[in-house]
Structure formats: C-alpha cells, structure tokens
Amino acid sequence: KKYKTINITYKVVGSDKIKEFKPNDPLYLMEESTTAGYKNKAVMNLRTNDNHPNEGKIEFKVIDPITKKEKIENVTFRFSSIKSEIFVEERDQTSDFMTHLKRNTGISFVRAGREIDFGTFDFFDLSIATERFWGCEILFEPILDEVFGVSNNKQGVKNMNALNAYQKKE
C-alpha cells in the first residue's frame, strides 16, 4: 500500500511568495513529508496489516446514541518501524533527521481521520534513543469519544495510561 501526500501551496499575506506546505507524518510512511534529509522517501514500513481481520483492531460494543441499539465499533492500531537500511545509515544522534524523529516520538490518537493528541502517555521513556525508531497511531470514530475521554473541544484524550490489572481483566 502506498501512502499519498496531498501537496498544498499557500501565499503569505502581504507577500507575492508562494510557499509549499508539507505534511508531518508521525508514522513516516509518506514519501513527501517534512522528514529531514528524506524529501522523497518513506523512512519506515507499516508493521500491521490494515485489512487483516485479526491484526491491529479491537472491537468495542457501544450504544448508538441515535438508534439506541448496540453496535460494534473498531479501534485500529497501526505500527511502523524504521527501515533497516536507514537504521544502519543514521547513527548521528545530533543530525537533523534524528532531531526530527525525536520531536515525533510518541503515540498519535486519530479521531475521525484527524490527529487530536500525541505523546508518550507514560508507556515508554522518551529519553531512550531506540524509542525513536517506531511509530503508533490509534484510530477511532467519534462514537468512541467517551471510551477515550475525548475533551469537549475535541483536542485531546484523557486517562490513556497503562492498564491496571482490573482493566486488563475487563
């Protein structure tokens, strides 16, 4: 599967200059993004199969607020990891590339196709350099807002810490 980039240009107010806008891709799957030193190359590979029924998905039973009927909604987990040749190539911890990776290290929560939160959520230690070599997106629809503790302004999630023993049992 190839991930496409939408190229957007914009004009700065009070200027005749046209600038190009590139997306920031926390999974590093897009060829055209803001990744330092890799303008036209994806630096990571997708490690989950989006179309496989048993991989990367958790089903939640919820009550539809409109129909009041129970329905199943999916939460999709997508993971990427650095390509081996780039891992070997990029050893300088102070390079622009490594700085870019460090800024993007974390878990992205994506609600209805839009990233609403990003961070470590206490699942791993950001200071460990090897944590920079993978990415994670957790995708869900608005019907699951309560499950994720989505704030009223739709700008974040709450209580996304490691599960305790009781929660794991449930």
Question: What is each residue range found by the language model?
Answer:
Residues 43-170:
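Charged regulatory segments coupled to nucleotide-binding catalytic modules in large multidomain enzymes
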